């Protein structure tokens, strides 16, 4: 099985590292890039969206929003699959 080329947009280094470790135990995974904010996530996607099979996106970033990243992915011709994360467990977010 070929590794899943994964792009991660997550502003917390601890969550990002734990997420990668957990996923690597479950599936063959190749993290192709990571971003911590909307601007750098969009910049990478503009140049490399075709280089990933899966995007894992945190909705609430310290700078910007994961929603803008998801909108940009929606506009790509070859869209990778997306997983949306949130560290907030409020009723509104659910």
Predicted regions and their residues:
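Acidic, metal-coordinating helix/loop segments flanking the phosphotransfer/catalytic sites
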Residues: 34-54
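Negatively charged, flexible loop motifs adjacent to catalytic sites
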Residues: 62, 88-92
């Amino acid at each position: 099985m070929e590794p899943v080329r994964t792009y991660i947009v997550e502003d917390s280094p601890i969550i990002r590292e734990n997420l990668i470790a957990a996923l690597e135990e479950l599936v063959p995974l190749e993290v192709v890039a990571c971003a911590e904010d909307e601007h750098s996530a969009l910049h990478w996607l503009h140049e490399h969206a075709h280089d990933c099979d899966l995007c894992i996106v945190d909705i609430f970033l310290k700078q910007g929003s994961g929603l803008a990243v998801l909108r940009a992915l929606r506009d790509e011709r070859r869209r990778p699959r997306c997983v949306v994360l949130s560290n907030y467990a409020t009723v509104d977010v659910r």
